[in-house]
Each structure stands twice: as structure tokens, then as C-alpha cells.
Design a protein with these regions (language model features):
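C-terminal alpha-helix plus adjacent terminal tail
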Residues: 1-52, 86, 98, 211-213, ...
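Glycine- (often His-adjacent) and acidic-residue-rich active-site loop
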Residues: 5-27, 95-131, 150, 178-180, ...
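Hydrophobic alpha-helical segments that mediate membrane insertion or helix-helix packing
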Residues: 56, 75, 93, 157-158, ...
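Short amphipathic alpha-helices within nucleic acid-binding modules
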Residues: 64-67
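Crotonase-fold acyl-CoA enzyme core
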Residues: 134-295
Length: 380
């Protein structure tokens, strides 16, 4: 076969379609998942013919890109569609807007549909597990483009990705123990692979939010990139201390400013504009690197590293699914409903001290128990 015959080969032969899904799980109107192909960009800014990126975008900005049941299906479909597309070099997993990549499951849906309905939540968790599996099994590299806060379940699906490039405005952390759940959708499995056991422990249980620079420092993301512009020039996130310093004998980096410095930084952020061009340039740089590697050797290498993540994830995802079903009848009901009712009550958490006191007195879970620990409406 000569070169001209080889170039005509695809046009002369039928190519089988290995995609499981069409476009039925994607949309354009929030809440939804948006799926689109974009060309790979070379270092000179030119599109590379025949080479694309698949963008899987969580589109629910009004609720900080929290994923509904239908959106979970969209992520599963997006990962499989990217896997089966011969033109796709890498999958870019991101969110709409500049506030959030994802804040996890949709708390309104959790509170109003799944709480006190554990069996239904079990079906939902089967989909959630398939979403994490879909990311870990995608046959293209998955880059998490962190356009804003990556919290709770958003942190977990982000950790399942292969690499993360983040806006330096983003914050990272868990919310489960504060809001009625536990970070058993991946964080308990993945965080010890990124940081020390004690750092992973504190991140999981404290619900403390860490900056993108701190995440880069502990090795949890590849790079934090400035996205704020003042007078046409990029500046680093003014709310974060981005120079290393010594505190109590330890080197500290990426901590949030406090007091007057925090107030000054907040004022700067109000006048600045958000521009993701540097963030996207970093994503393009990684994708172009992938484009210039043998694709099967690339995926063998990635799957070899993913296997370590998958080992721990596969050990725990099914027992965790069953625990979450049971938990939806108790603490999850309280946590999700407290968060969902915060506009009416002014508080997004229960009275934890009262809750512990009632448990100490062996009080049964009843309607009266729940009412005793939930914040009353503000007008009462």
C-alpha cells in the first residue's frame, strides 16, 4: 500500500461506532452536562487538524455546578463518548462560570427527594459510582480544569481525574461530616495518595477549605494559575499568601490572609475581572504534549498509575454505597435538610451539641428529635 492509498483508507472502509450513548444525556439549558469537541491547539495558537479535546462541562452555575441525577448520567455518557471518539486526544472536565467547578451532589435534590428514602438513594449511588468509574476508566487522559471551588463530591470526582490545572481563586475541601455525610465517594480512597496520612485525615474530617496554592504545594494539583486581572495585568489571588514563610517552626504556604489584609484583598477582587486565558493556555500545553506521544503507550502509562487509585476505590465503593443508603435515614436527612433550609433559618447546620446530648440520653430518632436539633425559622 502506497502513501496515497493509505491516506484514502478511512474513506474507503466503514468505521464502526463504539459509542454507547448519543446526545440524550447532554443539554444546553442548566442544570445539565454540556458535551462539545474543541480542536487541539498547538504552541503557535493554531488548531491541529483531526485532533480534538472533548469538553465535559457541569452546567448548573446557579447551584455552584452541583450535579443532579440527570447530570451524573451526563458525565458517565461524556466519559464514554470521549473514550470512543478516535479524534479525541484528551477529555477536559470542567464547570460553567468562575465560581465553582463543582460542589458535589445537588443538596436540594438530596433533601427533597432522597433523604429518608434510602432505597432510592442506593439507585443514585449506583450512578455516582459509575460516574467515578467512568472517569477512572476513560480511555483518554482526563484533565480537571478547576474553574472555581472544588468541594465535597466535586472534590471527589476531581480527584478521580488524571491531572488538575486550577484557577488560583479555587478552594478545595470536604463537607460531609459537617453536612450529614462522609467523603466516601473517593476522597477517603484518593487523598492519602496525594498527601500525608495526617493531611488526608484533616482534609477529610475538618471540612476546612484549602487554597489552590496550598493544594499545589502538597502535590494534589499540577498547577495553580492566576485568573484575576487589574488594569489589564494578571495578578495572583490577593486573598492568599503565596510566599512561603515559617510559622511555629513549620514552612507555611498558600494560607488565607486574615484581618485587614483579608479585607484589602476582598476589595481588590471586587474591582478585578476574571480571565481564564492563562488557565486554558496551561490546559492546551498539556494536551499538546499528549498529542505528541504514542496514544496507546500514553494510556498504558496512565492506566498503570490509575490502577493504584482504582485498587482502593474498588475495595470500598460497594460497602460505602450500602452505608450511605442507611445514613440517608438519619444524619444525612438532618444535614441535607439543614443546608437546604438555610435561607429560612439563617443556619446551614444543625445544633451539634444538642444532637450529641440527645444521643447520650439514648433518645430515639423521631420527628421530635429532628425538630429539636434543626434551626427554627428566623421569624420564630
Amino acid at each position: 500500500m502506497n502513501l496515497k492509498e493509505l491516506e484514502r483508507w478511512p474513506r474507503q472502509h466503514d468505521i464502526k461506532n463504539h459509542e454507547l450513548f448519543g446526545t440524550e444525556h447532554f443539554g444546553t439549558e442548566a442544570p445539565c452536562v454540556v458535551y462539545e469537541l474543541k480542536p487541539v491547539i498547538d504552541p503557535k495558537g493554531n488548531p491541529v487538524p483531526g485532533c480534538n479535546t472533548a469538553w465535559v462541562t457541569l452546567n448548573n452555575p446557579a447551584q455552584f455546578n452541583s450535579y443532579t441525577t440527570e447530570m451524573v448520567k451526563g458525565v458517565i455518557a461524556g466519559m464514554q463518548k470521549a473514550s470512543a471518539d478516535r479524534t479525541v486526544v484528551a477529555c477536559i472536565f470542567t464547570g460553567t462560570g468562575s465560581d465553582a467547578f463543582c460542589t458535589g451532589g445537588n443538596t436540594k435534590e438530596y433533601a427533597e427527594y432522597y433523604s429518608m428514602n434510602g432505597t432510592e438513594y442506593g439507585y443514585y449511588m449506583d450512578l455516582f459510582n459509575a460516574m467515578v468509574d467512568g472517569i477512572l476508566n476513560c480511555k483518554k487522559p482526563v484533565i480537571c480544569r478547576v474553574n472555581g471551588m472544588r468541594v465535597a463530591g466535586g472534590q471527589e470526582i476531581g480527584l478521580a481525574c488524571d491531572l488538575a490545572i486550577s484557577s488560583d481563586l479555587a478552594i478545595f475541601g470536604q463537607a460531609g461530616p459537617r453536612h450529614g455525610s462522609a467523603p466516601v465517594g473517593g476522597s477517603c480512597d484518593f487523598l492519602p495518595a496525594f498527601m500525608t496520612a495526617e493531611q488526608a485525615m484533616w482534609s477529610c474530617v475538618s471540612c476546612e477549605m484549602w487554597s489552590a496554592y496550598k493544594m499545589q504545594n502538597v502535590g494534589m494539583i499540577t498547577k495553580a494559575v492566576p485568573v484575576l486581572k487589574v488594569d489589564g495585568k494578571f495578578i495572583r489571588n490577593p486573598s492568599v499568601i503565596t510566599d512561603a514563610y515559617v510559622q511555629d517552626g513549620a514552612i507555611v504556604y498558600g494560607e488565607n490572609k486574615t484581618g485587614d489584609a483579608a479585607a484589602e484583598a476582598k476589595a481588590i477582587r471586587k474591582t478585578a475581572t476574571v480571565d481564564f486565558s492563562l488557565l486554558d493556555a496551561e490546559v492546551n500545553k498539556i494536551v499538546y504534549t499528549f498529542t505528541n506521544l504514542f496514544p496507546n503507550c500514553l494510556m498504558m502509562s496512565i492506566d498503570g498509575i490509575r490502577a493504584k487509585k482504582k485498587f482502593f476505590w474498588d475495595q470500598s465503593k460497594l460497602p460505602n454505597r450500602h452505608w450511605l443508603v442507611a445514613n440517608m435515614q438519619s444524619e444525612a436527612y438532618l444535614g441535607f435538610n439543614a443546608f437546604n433550609n438555610k435561607k429560612a433559618t439563617g443556619k446551614d447546620v444543625i445544633d451539634f451539641v444538642k444532637y450529641r446530648q440527645l444521643l447520650n440520653d439514648k433518645a430515639p430518632y423521631t420527628t421530635e428529635f429532628f425538630e429539636a436539633v434543626m434551626a427554627p425559622p428566623k421569624d420564630k
